[in-house]
């Protein structure tokens, strides 16, 4: 996988061969990747705004005022401007997940990774998070999303991958994947959820 011209996890040696990268060599590449987990991992002792500005200020060295301006714009994008000064414990699961998305976006990543971002949510709040993710995709954000939300995957993806026991068994466009899967396991999976 390449991010902004860098192969993730590897660097070329003096002979041009790819070798495993050290943690130090990976740090600049990692800073280009946002990650949103199943659990929101918000700091409970910090407000929504403080959660969002923490990494840009501490990791990127961004001025606090600039980080606040970016955070306020991101809160507007995820429709949580009114929660700026709230603590995570006062938010619904869907609201917390949208804060987690805003927090990742505050680092201005080239790529966003989502690990089952709706699996820990109540059914009523899933749509809030999927709508924000859809807007990101439509805005051109490159995303890799592990999900069982097949309607979302079908609508937003340009590639769909099916894994079984850690092995890719099917890959293709949404049309291919949902209408003409080639692997029997994929057909079984789709018949149970669609």
Report the location of each language-model feature.
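ABC ATPase "signature
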Residues: 171-172
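Conserved signature/switch motifs of ABC ATPase nucleotide-binding domains
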Residues: 86-89, 107, 139
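A short, surface-exposed alpha-helical micro-motif characterized by mixed small hydrophobic
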Residues: 153-155
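Catalytic Walker B motif of ABC-type/P-loop ATPase nucleotide-binding domains
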Residues: 112-115
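Helix N-cap at the start of a conserved alpha-helix in ABC-type nucleotide-binding domains
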Residues: 123-125
